[in-house]
């Protein structure tokens, strides 16, 4: 009878860390391999093969693979949002530009602070005529002809990820769903996220940005997870049961099957960092340390959190870099600075480090 081995893998922007546990003997083996940013699944599978080789076992002995990833985190932090568009209610085109009045701590009313670029520039924001009141009643009907024109406008410009946030859609999602249907019909290659699916709450700015983050990471996370799942199934084909169970860590510390991740990619935005905090919480519990400040410094980003009474701190008011991400998550402060971050000189002459990283390449 073969051994039963569980494998956990954390993929960062620079390194991939792997740990394997023999369920019978309790043997634990860990190793590390460079990540492969051009195709992260290659580094993932290299790590699986490497740790199993260290244990001297076959792929058929795998019972479960759990994965924490910073693919979404690093994509968001490095700030290249080309190919992302935004659709909103007519008259609300500037919702991202207005944003909030807050400025980074330490700047106050300093004249030299420059407002950062928006996640979607104004020229890639389109409006559709429609309007719901605060109770979800239709004030202005959804203009399907205008929606078709907008969908084709994005298609013709190669914008393949679009977030949709209509006013008061958290009460009544009908108009957003119709916009999604139009996009799917007119622009079949487009990844679409609608705010009524992603964040069904009031506050247009936060809802818009959270939806855009979901749309931005959706193709990256979906392709990444699908690629890993396919290769993992091939690798573990000797199981004879169609593959090994594959789970992905969520930002709130839970796990989700690979099949579900494609529809809710934003839940993985702090996947890797959340796993690190859970590990630190376990160490704090065993060592009877309280409270504990955790710091997880990788090659691309650095994550800091607090553990109290052996429990991670949770929040629904989180942020990744400068973007609010209002989904349940472990309360982690993430900055785009790590061991491989690239230094550069800003327009004001100041020396900056990150968020771009040399990565593993």
PLM segments and residue spans:
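N-terminally biased helix-coil "hinge/interface" segments that flank
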Residues: 1-361
